[in-house]
Amino acid sequence: MLVWLNGQFVPPDQAVLSVFDAGLQHGVGLFETMAARGGSVFRAQAHVRRLADSARELLLTDRLHVEPLVEAVAQVAARGDLDNARIRLTLTGGNLNLLQSQGADKVDPTILIVAQPATVYPDVYFERGVTMLITDGRQNPFDPMAGHKTLNYWPRIQALQQAASKRAGEALWLTVSNHLASGSVSNVFLVRDETLHTPFARGEEEPGALPSPVLPGITRAAIIATADQMGIETKKHMLDIEDLLGADEVFLTNSSWGVLSVVGVEQKKIGEGTPGEITKRLRAAWLELVEKETSED
């Protein structure tokens, strides 16, 4: 494990945050999880830019500089000396006690980067696919935090725990209007008639439509671009349970899994109940893309 805290590398057992840090006191913060191979990070700039955009939009800070932070992420990954790593970038509102003790009108955010060995999922996970459980919670498009990767993951973790208790690999969230949103830690795609379908993400909505609570995933964007290069069309629109259950294939995307097939939703089988051909092609293409981009650095 390697830790970088506020501009300095520190031993993990000496990495200390103030008890007055906004992330601890109020859950004020954002994070990014990135995949690294051989010391190179996949799409680091896209991840850091998303975090900086969210920080500005949510009034956390407008003083983040993307390029130096991308360089810090790269240094952590390189010095971590891990063939397959998970890089976690965390940004909080900083030490709020300084506002009172120093009379400051702003405080510097806390920036933490940690490199750890990536979780290794068994091959059978991808060969057989997983099932999903529909969570009881709903994503609210009017929540100003919706569609941003904030530190408040408690509802999502709780949903994942509920899914795991039913031997499901992911928990599916719907919106308050009962349209598909996303998994707890993933974006969702449907395949129907050899076309990809995925819910609108934040910033992709049609004019006049409700805001989308869906995170614009970095892997999601990579898969949409890859599919286009393969001649596979992607349609972004509102989807419901009937669309999901009637799909030929369903798969999930995130930085850890890449592409993961969904073969069932609770008791309902998706397609043939096995990973579909388009899903398998896209997973293979994603693995090649990660290998290519992390080998070029």
Task: Provide a role label for each language-model segment.
Residues 1-172, 176-179, 211, 224-297:
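Conserved alpha/beta cores of soluble small-molecule-handling proteins
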Residues 179-210:
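Glycine- and Gly-Pro-enriched alpha-helical subdomains that act as flexible
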Residues 218:
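Active-site microenvironment for binding and transforming phosphate-containing groups
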